[in-house]
Swiss-Prot record:
It comes from Chlamydia pneumoniae. Its EC number is 1.2.1.12. The gene is gap. Pathway: Carbohydrate degradation; glycolysis; pyruvate from D-glyceraldehyde 3-phosphate: step 1/5. Catalyzes the oxidative phosphorylation of glyceraldehyde 3-phosphate (G3P) to 1,3-bisphosphoglycerate (BPG) using the cofactor NAD. The first reaction step involves the formation of a hemiacetal intermediate between G3P and a cysteine residue, and this hemiacetal intermediate is then oxidized to a thioester, with concomitant reduction of NAD to NADH. The reduced NADH is then exchanged with the second NAD, and the thioester is attacked by a nucleophilic inorganic phosphate to produce BPG. This is Glyceraldehyde-3-phosphate dehydrogenase. The record marks H178 as: Activates thiol group during catalysis. Homotetramer. GO terms for cellular component: cytoplasm. NCBIfam families: GAPDH-I (TIGR01534). Pfam families: Gp_dh_C, Gp_dh_N. The lineage of its organism: Bacteria, Pseudomonadati, Chlamydiota, Chlamydiia, Chlamydiales. Signal peptide: none annotated.
């Protein structure tokens, strides 16, 4: 599969790292970003959180050279002017965060690409796929613009699926304690979205909205109207944690919930959901490729139907890994 990356920020760079790390059959032809190629090369080579890329990396004649691989740099603001038709692009990995509406993402298709995968929650009627949860519903005949949901939805959905399949869910509230991201400010400043969001990310725990819980219903429709949530942005570089407070349909014990999570992590959700019963903290999961790591020691029960569950996730690496998984699934099932 021939792909291009539009937007080479945190997720775009980590997606490329994952593709190259696993020697994927996915071939990256080009990267489109308005930042100069030499600066993008530097940011790809050196990463303050995930370390230096282990191969030779350099910029040469408007190309990113990684080992023996050569990837063209483009710098085009107008998506419809991009040379996707000439390059024979099968799929655009849309990582700018700007083209989340179907009509905007379809501009890549108008430029000659066959499909678009958005690395963010899609707006409107864009099909949303979470690996391990509903990815098998992908239809190559009609799903040309798709979304990989958000990192938080990718963490919450596997946990919710295990609960739904084994015990049923009456209702639930989710809180994600989320690492800082590039959209936040280092010192206080104005924010268009909400005033609190403009406060300095190094000095504050910042309450924020998130559509992650409601977005779970896009891949698990049975939960519509049963889940919602919020976020706290906290001053750490990477790794976030979901706190799910949930009322179940069936009476059970916390031990039985743990057993169900462990079994799922070893069978249907292997490689997606992990299970830990060790005394872990957030930094222990930097670089984790799992969507969700269920923390058996952190959860609690109030009674036989009301529980608080905890799951960790590397909101960068875990999410980027799922994008590559979804790419490869689309490739395999579009032939």
């Amino acid at each position: 599969m021939k792909v291009v990356i539009n937007g080479f920020g945190r997720i775009g760079r980590l997606v490329l790292r994952q593709i190259l790390k696993r020697n994927s059959s996915v071939e990256v032809l080009a990267i489109n970003d308005l930042v100069p190629g030499d600066a993008l090369t530097y940011l790809f080579k050196f990463d303050s959180t995930h370390g230096r890329f282990p191969e030779d990396v350099r910029c040469e004649a408007d190309h990113l050279i990684v080992g023996k691989r050569k990837i063209q740099f483009l710098s085009e603001r107008n998506v419809q002017n991009l040379p996707w038709k000439d390059l024979g692009v099968d799929l655009v990995i849309e990582c700018t965060g700007l083209f989340t509406k179907k009509e905007d993402a379809e501009k890549h298709i108008q430029a000659g690409a066959k499909r678009v995968l958005i690395s963010a929650p899609g707006k409107g009627d864009i099909p949303t796929f979470v690996m391990g949860v509903n990815h098998k519903t992908f239809n190559p005949e009609k799903d040309f613009v798709i979304s990989n949901a958000s990192c938080t939805t990718n963490c919450l959905a596997p946990i919710a699926k295990v609960l739904l399949d084994n015990f049923g869910i009456t209702e639930g509230l989710m809180t994600t304690v989320h690492a800082a991201t590039a959209t936040q400010l280092v010192v206080d400043g104005p924010s268009k979205k909400d005033w609190r969001g403009g406060r300095g990310c190094l000095q504050n725990i910042i309450p924020a909205s998130t559509g992650a819980a409601k977005a779970v219903t896009l891949c698990l429709p049975e939960l519509k109207g049963k889940l919602t949530g919020m976020a706290f942005r906290v001053p750490i570089e990477d790794v976030s944690v979901v706190d799910l407070t949930v009322r179940l349909d069936k009476s059970t014990t916390y031990d039985d919930i743990c057993k169900a999570m462990k079994q799922a992590s070893e069978t249907d959700l292997k490689g997606i959901l992990d299970y830990t019963d060790e005394q872990v903290v957030s930094s222990d999961f930097i670089g984790s490729e799992y969507s969700s790591i269920f923390d058996a020691l952190a959860g609690i029960a109030l009674n036989d139907r009301f529980f608080k569950l905890v799951a960790w996730y590397d909101n960068e690496t875990g999410y980027a890994t799922r994008i590559v998984d979804l790419l490869e699934y689309v490739e395999k099932n579009s032939k």
